[in-house]
């Protein structure tokens, strides 16, 4: 399978050119140990500056252009751009390409934090919609087509709709229906497809955003496929999006010193998917099913299945390689289970108050070794399984403490993110004067920094929104349960930054 950029890199390496140019480590000779040995001499020799024979990502006319065209052909888009600043950069590019300052865009409330940055850059106005809440599992589903129709009825001037599909848990939205609704209102559909670069290559997975009519989709090739971390693709259809403008925006946001190892890994991952995609995804399904079957045997654990969510909560289908266990019956938080698994040298993708997510890919499928890993996971979980009656043989004080802890966990698990009120445009807050106040004293003030509990990074409150007593209480509740906070300058959340009101 042709790999235009990788092949050009290999030819350059074979020339044994002496570099009297950047980077300063000169092919690794000047790099400090132990990193030099860990990376290896071949990789370091390919950490080069922009060379005519290796093309220019800002004006591609050779191997990079060909590599991007091959990726577009594979995914069914009209243009594909290598995004070496990850899907964060690709999402920023989508928003800057599709929107003008002041334009309104429908945004799921659980959109990734990168969307906030993109909205500030684009000076666009978000109209938020809360995805359906799955109370049984304590997680959010998807935005429904009905919600999108209602949004256009209230805000007919919406220029775009943004979806996160699939979400962290592999739940795909009704992308085709929502694309049709958006297009009927002369709006474009932008999809954060970070967790779906593998979709469209096996019939047991949800269809891809491009195949469902999306106008742009940002994909994290590194999350599921074989590219290096930080490597993503931006797919664009040209019917409603100006492809030249998209290229200009990508150039604006991309470093003038892109790493060729990163770009080469995108080319290699694309070629691998083109040649072996169906086989790779079959391997991923086998590995996921082995884990699912074993986890399902553990009493009290519920492994979330496609039939639990598909056709409900705005969810069209579930990517079953995202293996999620729900711990509600155990009465233990996902944070606790995640920490215990890490002590056993098992690192998971995501934890929240009720769930633990295992991300399984084709690279996990080596039957004997994978079975050993699955056994380790299940053995650890069996040890953590709560005893049948934890209150037996306890003192009165211990019983009260356990009952209080259980009540607090139940309260946290049932809590939904409070509704917020936008008071000031995000861009105004970004450039405005700020001050720091105790979280307990923030009620009524304008938030000047995003606050998310991460993963999955769903904002509790965003810049420009007003703190309420419910938001402050929710933040305290989540922090007490051990969820790490992301966004504020003070990650202990004792204080928050607010807009100075003059």
What are these regions (language model features)?
Residues 1-62, 455-456:
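N-terminal "arm"/small-domain region of PLP-dependent enzymes with the aminotransferase-like
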Residues 5-10, 14-18, 34-38, 77, ...:
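Conserved PLP-enzyme active-site core in the AAT-like
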Residues 44-86:
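Conserved N-terminal alpha-helix of the aminotransferase class I/II PLP-enzyme fold
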Residues 167, 329, 362-366:
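A generic structural motif
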Residues 209, 234-243, 310, 314, ...:
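Flexible glycine/proline-rich, aromatic-decorated loop/lid segments
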Residues 288-289, 307-324:
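Conserved glycine-rich beta-strand-loop-beta hairpin in the small C-terminal domain of fold type I
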Residues 325-332:
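Short, surface-exposed ligand-recognition loops at beta-strand->loop->(often short) alpha-helix junctions
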Residues 340-343, 349-502:
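PLP-dependent enzyme catalytic core of the Aspartate aminotransferase-like
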């Amino acid at each position: 399978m042709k790999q235009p950029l990788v092949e050009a890199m290999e030819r350059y390496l074979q020339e044994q050119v002496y570099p009297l140019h950047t980077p300063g480590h000169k092919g690794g000779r000047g790099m400090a140990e132990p990193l030099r040995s860990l990376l290896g001499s071949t990789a370091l020799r390919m950490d080069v500056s922009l060379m005519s024979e290796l093309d220019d990502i800002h004006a591609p006319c050779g191997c990079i252009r060909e590599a991007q065209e091959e990726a577009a052909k594979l995914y069914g888009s009209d243009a594909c751009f290598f995004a070496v600043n990850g899907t964060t950069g690709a999402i920023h590019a989508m928003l800057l390409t599709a929107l003008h300052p002041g334009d309104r865009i429908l945004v799921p409330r659980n959109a990734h934090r990168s969307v906030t940055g993109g909205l500030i850059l684009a000076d666009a106005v978000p109209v938020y919609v809360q995805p359906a809440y799955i109370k049984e599992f304590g997680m959010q589903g998807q935005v429904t087509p009905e919600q999108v129709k209602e949004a256009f009825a209230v805000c007919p001037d919406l220029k775009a709709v943004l979806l996160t599909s699939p979400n962290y848990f592999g739940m795909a939205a009704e992308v085709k229906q929502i694309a049709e609704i958006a297009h009927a209102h002369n709006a474009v559909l932008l999809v954060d497809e970070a967790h779906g670069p593998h979709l469209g290559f096996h019939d047991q997975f949800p269809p891809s955003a491009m195949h469902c009519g999306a106008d742009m989709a940002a994909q994290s090739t590194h999350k599921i496929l074989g590219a290096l971390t930080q490597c993503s693709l931006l797919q664009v259809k040209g019917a409603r999006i100006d492809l030249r403008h998209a290229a200009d925006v990508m150039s604006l946001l991309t470093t003038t010193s892109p790493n060729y190892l990163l770009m080469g890994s995108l080319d290699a991952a694309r070629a691998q998917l083109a040649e072996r995609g169906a086989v790779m995804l079959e391997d991923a399904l086998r590995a996921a099913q082995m884990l699912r079957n074993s986890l399902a045997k553990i009493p009290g654990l519920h492994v979330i299945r496609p039939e639990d969510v598909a056709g409900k909560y705005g969810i069209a289908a579930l990517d079953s390689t995202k293996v999620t266990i729900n711990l509600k019956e155990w009465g233990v938080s996902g944070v606790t289970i995640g920490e215990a698994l890490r002590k056993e040298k098992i690192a998971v993708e995501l934890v929240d108050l009720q769930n633990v997510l295992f991300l399984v890919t084709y690279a996990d499928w080596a039957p004997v070794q994978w079975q050993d890993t699955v056994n380790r996971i299940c053995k650890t979980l069996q040890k953590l399984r709560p005893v049948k009656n934890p209150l037996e043989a306890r003192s009165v004080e211990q019983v009260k403490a356990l009952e209080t802890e259980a009540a607090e966990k139940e309260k946290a698990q049932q809590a939904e993110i409070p509704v917020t009120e936008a008071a000031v445009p995000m861009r105004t807050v970004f450039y405005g004067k700020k001050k720091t106040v105790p979280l307990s004293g923030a009620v009524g003030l304008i938030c000047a920094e995003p606050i998310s509990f991460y993963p999955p990074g769903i904002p509790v409150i965003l810049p420009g929104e007003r703190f309420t007593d419910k938001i402050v209480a929710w933040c305290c509740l989540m922090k007490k349960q051990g969820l790490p906070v992301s966004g504020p300058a003070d990650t202990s959340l004792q204080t928050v930054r607010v807009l100075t009101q003059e």
